[in-house]
């Protein structure tokens, strides 16, 4: 049992550790399945299902209709065959980084570490990317910090429900696209997008939702797994 309760006020009382203030410079890494299409940005998995978006049109022209080639079909193509954790760590050390933060799971639901909670982490590169990088960083006295964007997965690819795509009407638990709930308002596509009035920054991921307890249990389990591993 920790020092926090399930309120924004309690969570806002959290203070950053001293080492973080002292570190001055760190590197935040976005790398995952979305690097296969390498178009737009790391929101490709959402934008390819939004009619009228540049990624939607690019996807059809490059890979075919979303019904025939969906986001999940990129996973076998994400091999990461040139990934070398030691080489990365050497580069970060030369750059002067004191901490490195890879995204363990982005909004797309693909885990970049060896997870026991999802079959998808056993596909693609079939490597514990975060774990291997963490081992090399430790040898160089660089702090490994990890980011999880799982919470946004609740609604992230819901655009696929609005037309005939590879997303089934009933999405089973554990499926890459689960649960893809339609959001109550359109989320901004990237850090420069504007939020609706009254939605505090940092709370936009779940604002306006009556979030499914099953999803929150799944989110908590994945979060704890990242910490434990």
Task: Please give the residue ranges for each predicted region.
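Mature catalytic domains of secreted/periplasmic carbohydrate-active enzymes
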Residues: 1-229
């Amino acid at each position: 049992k920790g020092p926090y309760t399930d309120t924004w006020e309690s969570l806002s009382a959290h203070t950053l550790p001293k080492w973080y203030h002292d570190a001055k410079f760190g590197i935040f890494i976005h790398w995952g399945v979305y690097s296969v299409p390498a178009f737009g940005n790391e929101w490709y998995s959402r934008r390819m299902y939004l009619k009228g978006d540049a990624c939607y049109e690019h996807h059809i022209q490059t890979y075919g209709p979303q019904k025939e080639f969906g986001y999940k079909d990129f996973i076998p193509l994400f091999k990461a065959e040139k990934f070398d954790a030691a080489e990365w760590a050497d580069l970060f050390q030369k750059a002067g980084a004191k901490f490195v933060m890879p995204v363990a799971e982005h909004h797309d639901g693909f885990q970049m570490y060896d997870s026991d909670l999802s079959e998808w982490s056993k596909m693609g590169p079939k490597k514990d990317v975060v774990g291997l990088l963490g081992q090399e960083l430790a040898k160089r006295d660089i702090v490994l910090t990890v980011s999880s964007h799982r919470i946004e997965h609740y609604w992230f690819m819901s655009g696929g429900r609005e037309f005939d795509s590879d997303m089934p009407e009933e999405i089973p638990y554990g499926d890459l696209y689960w649960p893809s709930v339609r959001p109550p308002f359109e989320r901004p596509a990237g850090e420069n997008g504007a939020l609706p009035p009254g939605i505090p920054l940092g709370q936009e991921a779940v604002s306006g939702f009556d979030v499914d307890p099953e999803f929150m249990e799944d989110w908590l389990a994945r979060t704890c797994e990242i910490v434990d591993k």
